[in-house]
Amino acid sequence: MSSSNCVALVTGANKGIGFVIVRDLCRRFSGDVVLTARDEARGRAAVQQLQAEGLSPLFHQLDIDDRQSIRALRDFLRKEYGGLDVLVNNAGIAFKTADTTPFHIQAEVTMKTNFFGTRDVCTELLPLIKPQGRVVNVSSFVSVNSLKKCSRELQQKFRSETITEEELVGLMNKFVEDTKNGVHRKEGWPDTAYGVTKIGVTVLSRIHARKLSEQRGGDKILLNACCPGWVRTDMGGPKASKSPEEGAETPVYLALLPSDAEGPHGEFISEKRVVQW
């Protein structure tokens, strides 16, 4: 086992917001910080960059689209640390606005990573979260705006306090199927694949927080979704209003909520404040 038994982990962390979250956690979290990336060479280059700044992150490969990759990480964490203290689910993708890929393919590809990949990471790693652990799912304000563009019926489902993970999975699959059949507008969906996937991430966070409260209420684990803002990254583009450092502020705040904090839990957070879902 590692000499430091506390560990924080960030997915999709070789660049952008994820990279800065790792840097901030290296400075402020008392324990090991694991930077993960799909591409090993890029991940190790990011670690070297932080080492040049005098920081000491560790690297582990993780492709959230690959269940075997997730399980290899799970086994590493279990063996080396006996669990996980902080999980930041940051990995995600988006097609550029000008991309000419057919919408139904954009929907399928984006959903596979942003929703189902994140869900698979949660399925494998949430059971490892230690008492007083922190889980942060990086969603987007686009999820709030996209929710408002959904039909009233879909809004009610996504805002439900009793929606199950299985029901949410069914809805995410239905969106992809509806885009393939060319009926997504008729079925009440907005014209944004990215936005719908992030609705999924936000609602999944609410479901998982509810489950944690029911099953591990005494462990004081806090799980939230958050919006980093519009950030100057490869995804956000050069005209975005925030630097990656500013974008990392809310995720890091949630990752480092003090051990005696009662909340927030199961909320959507922007600018360190709870936003009505």
Curated annotation (Swiss-Prot):
Record gene name: CBR1
Enzyme Commission designation: 1.1.1.184, 1.1.1.196, 1.1.1.197, 1.1.1.71
Binding site for substrate: S140
Organism: Bos taurus
Alphabetized UniProt keyword annotations: Acetylation, Cytoplasm, Lipid metabolism, NADP, Oxidoreductase, Phosphoprotein
Record's protein name: Carbonyl reductase [NADPH] 1
Principal subcellular localisation of the protein: cytoplasm
Alphabetized GO MF terms: 15-hydroxyprostaglandin dehydrogenase (NADP+) activity; 15-hydroxyprostaglandin-D dehydrogenase (NADP+) activity; carbonyl reductase (NADPH) activity; prostaglandin E2 9-reductase activity; S-nitrosoglutathione reductase (NADPH) activity
UniProt xrefs under Pfam families: adh_short
